[in-house]
């Protein structure tokens, strides 16, 4: 700074605005000229960095920033204030504050260069009036002190206008954007015959921006009404959309329509009285036994082998199947297999007695047993196979239990 001072102050013939003197008289003269220039005091302590000339004036910080295009960094740190041109609508003045009042040239502690870069002329978004003579300085009282806030003009133009920023979300409480979102949702919905989306009534109180890809279309809600008739559409009444009447719903595909018809037919078959196969006991008549034999054989021909655990508990299995199918027939996809008919108590008892005598049957003995319990040859063979597997499993568990009982794990 000493070299610069010696270069700038060789002679007393320089004007006052070109001096870098550290004397308090020169600085007070500069501060007085800044105060009398019409821009008012800076609001800082002791009439500090005054606002004047052609730069931006920040009322909340008391800082005057000269424009970087007209005032280079080396000159504004020394207090050289040339007359500014009328390129922008900025008043020309004999001096403008580069440092604080009463401070030396080296005390430019507010760091003007990064803020000047932020308010650079090509990057700034201040409105530029048409070229013309600069108006006289405005004579108005200084603005009242207010909390720090960014300049509104510097942030209003921060993005280019051709960037599609507003297409990614929609404030549902604005009336001009709601038809756009509703039309887009109607185009995106795979079933466009549903009711129109009522998206404008969603955010009337909150005003939260909802992304554009999260549009509430009726595709997922109405797809639940496949197996339940009008039940799916009635459940939508609690949501933001009006309930869709069952008659106006979309047409079911032929495969789904046939599947729903089969499900309804099976429900009616379940609600009907049980078949006589379950009712035939040890004291049934000959005619009832023949009907039971025919129905059970037909059911067994169409169904694969039943498991042994379900045969051992026919009452619990029948009750659980009837309740489970009535409760979950509209939740799960049903297979094409018919409902398995478990063996009756009489049939299970006869088969168990024969198994105690002989675990393996010949074909002649198997035919005799099948005639006595009114089952087919294949049913008896499968029952004996399952019973042997069950016995093998029980023997293995008992052996493991005996082995572990010999060890003390205390």
Swiss-Prot record:
Q: Which GO terms describe its cellular component?
A: chromatin; cytoplasm; nucleoplasm; nucleus; transcription regulator complex
Q: Which SMART domains match?
A: HOX
Gene Ontology MF terms: DNA-binding transcription activator activity, RNA polymerase II-specific; DNA-binding transcription factor activity, RNA polymerase II-specific; histone deacetylase binding; RNA polymerase II cis-regulatory region sequence-specific DNA binding; sequence-specific double-stranded DNA binding
Q: Where is the composition biased (Pro residues)?
A: 130-151
| Gene Ontology biological process terms in this record | anterior/posterior pattern specification; embryonic limb morphogenesis; male gonad development; positive regulation of transcription by RNA polymerase II; prostate gland development; proximal/distal pattern formation; regulation of transcription by RNA polymerase II; response to estrogen
Under Pfam families, the record lists:
Homeodomain
| Region (Disordered) location | 89-158, 221-339
Q: Which domain of life is it from?
A: Eukaryota
Q: Which residues bind DNA?
A: 336-395
Q: Where is the composition biased (Low complexity)?
A: 235-249, 294-312
This protein's record includes keyword DNA-binding:
yes
Where would you find this protein in the cell? Nucleus
Q: Does the keyword Nucleus apply?
A: yes
- Keywords noted in UniProt: Developmental protein, DNA-binding, Homeobox, Nucleus, Transcription, Transcription regulation
- Quote the biased-composition stretches of kind Gly residues, using this chain's numbering: 95-109, 224-234
Give the protein's biological function: Sequence-specific transcription factor which is part of a developmental regulatory system that provides cells with specific positional identities on the anterior-posterior axis. Binds to the DNA sequence 5'-AA[AT]TTTTATTAC-3'.
Q: How does it assemble?
A: Interacts with SIRT2; the interaction is direct.
Q: Which family does it belong to?
A: Belongs to the Abd-B homeobox family.
Q: What name is this protein filed under?
A: Homeobox protein Hox-A10
Q: What is the organism field in this record?
A: Homo sapiens
Annotated gene: HOXA10
